[in-house]
Amino acid sequence: MTSHQVSGVYPVRLLLLLILLLTGLATGCQTGMGQSVQSDPSSDNAVEAIPSPILPNELDQVASFRELIDQAESIKAFERQPLVDRYVAMLPDAPIMSEDVAVFIWRGGASSVQLVGDMNSWDMENAPQFDKLEGTDLWYLETVYEEDARLDYMFVIDEDDWRLDPLNPRTILGGFGPNSELLMPGYKIPGELLPTSGSIAAGKLETHTLESSHLGQNRTIFVYEPAGQLVGAKTPSIYINDGGDFLNLIGATTILDRLIAEREIPPVVAVFVPPINRGLEYALNEDYASFMADELVPFVQQTYNTDPDPARTAIMGYSLGGLEALFTAITRHEVFGLIAGQSGAYSVGEDAVIKRVQRASRAYQTGGSSRQELRMYFVVGTYETAVAGDSIDGSILGANRRLADVLETTKYDYLYEERPEGHSLGLWKGTFGTALRYLYNPEYE
């Protein structure tokens, strides 16, 4: 009897233990899987609730960046940094761009971040401020430019610390060192600046020193003699103001090598003339024009067998060098029949050189004794609106447009271009080949 009672009690106890065990497991599963754990930012063991990160979208990087900001602002500030870290780690390039929008980003400790560059004429007073994403090290600025714009820029940290964009590998030399370079999606790098798979025959560069009676000083010049020049043939020539910059910063000889090798232009002798006193020599200076026409050109013609025909003799320059190039060609048209001006400062002397062009065009149209045939190429950046030294309206763009208005009334052959760029070596390097093609290839328009 007793034994039957004991054997009946154990199954009941086992059943109760099994029920309790199953109940505990169910409760534990509910707590572990169904309930959310709240993070305590003050606790060392807190677990951050990080949503799925937004990653850069190659098809629309700007849209994905905006999604990142929206997502980050929807969560607590202390949870945002991992989202930023993951996004930037996957970012293929910077600035972030799509069509006509560019987003600049900066990461680091700062009290302010600003953008300066061609887009605001490097003016700190008009430099836009970046926004900071609270709780992170991310600063960002969304801007709008033309789809084919090319602009130099830098970041200014805490109002006086000028920096290159550390996330942008593209830089370009400026007047005070390297700048970061923005290439909008529609900008096309000129073919002559792209890498080439084959070998290119290189011309040779020679140095000469001339004694100038017009300038009362010795002048050093550099002469590029092209490869593939026909023996005994008279070669066209081009004389380039700011010759040192064209050699060292623009890489003019490499561009000449490429265009000649690919037969986009004929072999050309290029004469690079560095200034000694740039502000004096390039300010409508008749002595400098006489040095070029009466001393330098005859020396080059005799030494390198260049063609004396004005229709095959060019002069060019940028900014003030472009002003002096146009002035020299207009006043000495019997020597120079080809002109190229890049961002020319034509307002100097109250538009004096523009007025000379107007007078020369009247003589050309009437067929008088001073009749001259000229072929001209001019280019200016649409962001060249506040460049120091342009005396009439503070705008190199404005001066070039006034020149273009005059040219439109003439019978001269000319090509005038405006590009969404600034007063930059990048513009002049990118259009050096275009100028050469227009001047020396009559079929190029």
Residue ranges and their predicted role:
Residues 251, 302, 309-371:
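Primarily recognizes the serine-hydrolase "nucleophile elbow" in alpha/beta-hydrolase
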Residues 30-32:
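Bacterial signal peptide processing site
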Residues 25-28:
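C-terminal motif of bacterial Sec signal peptides marking the signal peptidase cleavage site
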Residues 244-295:
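Active-site machinery of serine-nucleophile hydrolases
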Residues 222-225, 232-244:
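Short beta-strand element of the alpha/beta-hydrolase
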Residues 229-233, 280-319:
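Gly/Ser-rich "nucleophile elbow"/oxyanion-hole loop immediately N-terminal to the catalytic nucleophile
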Residues 95-148, 158-187:
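Aromatic-rich carbohydrate-binding modules that target alpha-glucans
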Residues 379, 385, 395-445:
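C-terminal catalytic histidine-bearing segment of alpha/beta-hydrolase fold enzymes
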